[in-house]
């Protein structure tokens, strides 16, 4: 399955400061990256992945056995390369830092030049010889890793978050644009990613959105947009009146599509805590010892908030 393990390990280090653990993982993380290079890299330098191995079966853009260049795997590999480069710096390995820094730069250019659909103004899956020509939530994953340039060219993609023909639905953000003729056409109950809401995807998009709002000089999104999507994300996670998270839910009714099946309730694929801490409350982990806090909370929503017992870089902040 696709993953962003190196990025996640570095992100953990930016919170707990445990350098010994980070360096202990260095060899394994590099070995994993090299394996992906051997098995999933295309001739043009991009990476392919099937829908199933991305954890996103039955999508509009791909298929269970299709080897397409998707925004997911290519963003993950970029994030992992950036992380490995940083780990190289932290370990005093200049060769490693340079090697993976160059890989990250190459992938950044490939994603921006090959996966950006200029007609749709969106990052999309590239099939064998053409774009899949469908906007899907995975098109926001490049911002999960701060991949796109800080130019106005790419920020227009975020307007789709607020468009009811795009990804905006009564119960949250859909996994495919609602205007597409194949939206929700693949049935129900077999892991469809053709439009229904998946907390996994919502969590990725909300993380990417927080990065976009914190790290880019953008004018598209406001705190109220992020706050509203967080409200929907939280409100959707109930079943029969109790807190619950399952596989995926109907975008209009909020019904968990496999809610009463045993398998569904084992899905803990939501980075709920991280979204609250680093997004909504806005404690932004860093490599240095600066404490950066930028809440994405509209001025008229809360009089106050308290995030208590926050362990950061070996200190209890509150």
Show which residues each predicted segment covers.
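Alpha-helical scaffold segments in carbohydrate-active enzymes
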Residues: 28-42, 76, 83-86, 99-117, ...
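Non-catalytic C-terminal accessory modules of carbohydrate-active enzymes
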Residues: 191, 208-318
């Amino acid at each position: 399955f696709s993953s962003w393990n190196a990025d996640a390990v570095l992100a953990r280090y930016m919170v707990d400061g445990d350098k010994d653990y980070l360096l202990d993982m260095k060899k394994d993380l590099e070995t994993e990256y090299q394996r992906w290079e051997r098995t999933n890299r295309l001739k043009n330098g991009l990476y392919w992945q099937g829908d199933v191995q991305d954890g996103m079966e039955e999508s509009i853009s791909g298929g269970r056995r299709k080897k397409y260049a998707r925004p997911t795997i290519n963003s993950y590999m970029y994030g992992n390369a950036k992380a490995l480069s940083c780990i190289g710096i932290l370990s005093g390995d200049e060769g490693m830092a340079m090697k993976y820094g160059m890989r990250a730069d190459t992938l950044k250019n490939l994603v921006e030049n090959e996966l950006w659909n200029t007609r749709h103004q969106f990052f999309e899956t590239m099939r064998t010889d053409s774009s899949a020509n469908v906007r899907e939530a995975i098109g926001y994953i490049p911002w999960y890793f701060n991949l796109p340039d800080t130019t106005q060219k790419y920020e227009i993609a975020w307007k789709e978050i607020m468009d009811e023909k795009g990804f905006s639905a009564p119960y949250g953000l859909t996994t495919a644009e609602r205007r597409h003729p194949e939206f929700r056409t693949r049935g129900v109950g077999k892991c469809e990613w053709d439009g229904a809401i998946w907390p996994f995807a919502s969590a990725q998009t909300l993380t990417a959105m927080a990065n976009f709002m914190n790290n880019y000089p953008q004018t598209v999104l406001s705190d109220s947009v992020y706050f509203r999507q967080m409200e929907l994300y939280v409100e959707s996670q109930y079943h029969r009146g109790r807190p619950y998270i399952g596989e995926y839910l109907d975008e209009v009714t909020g019904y968990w599509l496999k809610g009463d099946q045993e398998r569904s309730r084992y899905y803990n694929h939501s980075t709920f805590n991280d979204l609250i801490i680093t997004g909504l409350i806005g404690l932004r982990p860093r490599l240095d010892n600066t404490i950066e806090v930028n809440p994405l909370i509209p001025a008229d929503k809360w009089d106050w908030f308290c995030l208590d017992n926050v362990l950061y870089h070996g200190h209890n902040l509150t």
